[in-house]
């Protein structure tokens, strides 16, 4: 168990921001929120009351994985000051609705796949499809509490044919990206090294990877 104080972070706002699909709300009462998060092969329970957070991991795991995941080295207070002193009323209004949102530093492969699933979809359906993909691929997290996100080569072929997964027309695109990444194991590492424009073009080369999703 590890406790920490963090300003400018709201678990509920992050969970509902549409950037992550492996957060499960465990509890919400008396202004306390608790979520389970699966990422990087780990499973974390995290609760929040005000700016106080309690986590199921120890300090070493927090510093090794979750600190960077929650982007704690970025000064969101400074960003807030710039927004609040700007002349942009639309930006101020948007910030007032999501002042606790942080840009999560998620696993690149998970983002590539989940945002393909997100095309022309809604958050509850996306979340369900991602949950089923992880469960039916059967790769356990390190502590055995849940399922890790399947890497290339870890998804049984029949999953792409199973209509109950909710992939719809996206099933063929998912099959293609999994096969491509398995056949080209350096692709993700090379993608990380590219400029924004080159990375965008590389993603758009993949089957039906739309610009909005690639971005």
Task: Show which residues each predicted segment covers.
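HhH-family (HhH-GPD) DNA N-glycosylase catalytic core used in base-excision repair
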Residues: 1-215
């Amino acid at each position: 168990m590890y406790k920490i104080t963090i300003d400018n972070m709201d678990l509920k706002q992050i969970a509902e921001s549409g950037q992550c699909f492996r957060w499960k709300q465990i509890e919400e009462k008396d202004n306390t929120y608790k979520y389970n998060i699966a990422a990087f092969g780990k499973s974390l329970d995290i609760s929040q009351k005000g700016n106080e957070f309690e986590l199921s991991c120890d300090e070493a795991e927090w510093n090794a994985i979750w600190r960077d995941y929650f982007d704690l080295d970025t000064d969101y207070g400074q960003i807030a000051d710039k927004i609040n002193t700007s002349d942009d009323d639309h930006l101020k209004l948007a910030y007032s609705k999501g002042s606790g949102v942080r840009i999560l530093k998620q696993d690149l492969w998970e983002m590539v796949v989940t945002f393909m699933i997100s095309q022309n979809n809604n958050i509850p359906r996306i979340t369900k499809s991602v949950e089923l993909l992880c469960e039916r691929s059967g790769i356990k997290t390190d502590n055995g509490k849940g399922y890790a996100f399947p890497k290339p080569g870890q998804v049984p072929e029949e999953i792409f044919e199973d209509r109950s997964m909710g992939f719809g027309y996206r099933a063929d695109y998912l099959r293609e990206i999994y096969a491509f990444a398995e056949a080209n194991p350096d692709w993700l590492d090379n993608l990380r090294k590219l400029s924004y424009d080159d990375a965008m073009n590389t993603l758009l080369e993949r089957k039906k990877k739309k610009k909005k999703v690639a971005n």
